[in-house]
C-alpha cells in the first residue's frame, strides 16, 4: 500500500524517537511505500527555526516532504487553524491510506476532498495526543471557543474518517468528549520504542558498563527515571524518597526546566545520580542497567519506552493510563508523598513481588510496546477493508 502521513503541528527531525518518525519507519519495514509530509519548522539544540522546501528519502526508508505551514487568514485564528496544503500532493501520489496526525488542523479536509473526488476507497486515519493535562479545557471562554471550532472541524469530516486513535486510553476519551468523535470510531494506538534500539542480546553488558561508569554496585537496587523534569513530573519527591535508603540508587536521565532547576538541585543527595540529558538512542542502555523504572508524576513517552525495554515499572496513577500495565509488569501509586514512594521501593527491592513483575516484564506481553507491533495495528482497518 501507499501511505501518506500528514503532520502539520509539530517540528520534525531525523533520528528523533517520536511517533512521526517511528510509525512511518516501521510501516516502511512492512513493505509499504510511505511518505511523511511535515512543515518546514525545525528544532535544533532547543532552538526552533524554519528551513526551505525539502523532498528526500530518510535513512529509515520513507520519503519526507517539507512544506511551509499555512496560517488561517483571520488574525485570532492564525495559529489555531494552521495547516499544510496537501491536496495536489495527494492527487499526484494517490495514497491508499492517509494518516493525519492530530485533530486540530484543517489539512484533514484536503484528505477528505481527495477521498471524495479521487479515491473513494482511501482509508483516512487520525490520532489524538491531547488530554486534559496537555490540551485545552472548557472551564474558560477560550477553551469553550476552541471546543466549538474543533468539534465543527471534526463534524465536517466525520463521514469520511475510518478510525481515530488515542495514543493513551485517556486521550481516546478526550477525543470523544472534546472533539465529539463517536465511540465506535475510536481505538487506542499506544506509543512505544524503536525495536532497532533495543539491544536485548547485550543487556548484561550495558548493565555492567553503565553501573561501573556511574559508580553503582551490581548488588544495589537501581531505579531509573527522567525526561523533561518539572514540578508535574514529581521526580523531586522520588529524590527525597531514596535519600535515606541503603543499597538503593536513583539514576535520573533528563534535565530540569529553567523555572524548576533551582528546586530540582535542592533535592540532590548522595543516593541520586544526575546523568543529564541522554540521547534517545542511548537511553535504552540505561533502562537495561536498571532494576526498576519509576515515574511518580505526569505522563512521558519514557513510560512506554521503559515498558518496551522489559523493565518493571512504577507509575503515578492517572485515570485512563492503565495501558502501561500489560500482564503485571507495572504497579501504580495513588499518592506521591516521599513516604509512600519509599514504601513502594522497599516493597519491591529484590522481593518475590518484584520477581513476579520482572517475569511479566520479560515476557512477550510487553512486545505490544514495540513499534513493529504498533505499525501493524495502525493499519488493521486498512487491511480488513
Give each language-model segment a name.
Residues 1-52, 56, 60-62, 240-243, ...:
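N-terminal subdomain of nucleotide-sugar transferases
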Residues 352-382:
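A charged, aromatic-enriched C-terminal amphipathic alpha-helix characteristic of glycosyltransferases
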Residues 113, 117, 132, 144-164:
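Membrane-proximal helix-turn-helix segments that form the acceptor-binding/catalytic region
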Residues 261-282:
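Nucleotide-activated donor-binding/catalytic signature segment of Leloir-type glycosyltransferases, i.e.
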Residues 193, 226-230, 249-262:
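Glycosyltransferase donor-sugar binding loop
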Residues 170, 192:
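Carbohydrate-associated surface elements
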Residues 288-298, 311-312:
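Acidic donor-binding loop of glycosyltransferase active sites
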Residues 4, 165, 217-233, 239-242:
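Conserved donor-binding/catalytic core segment of Leloir-type glycosyltransferases
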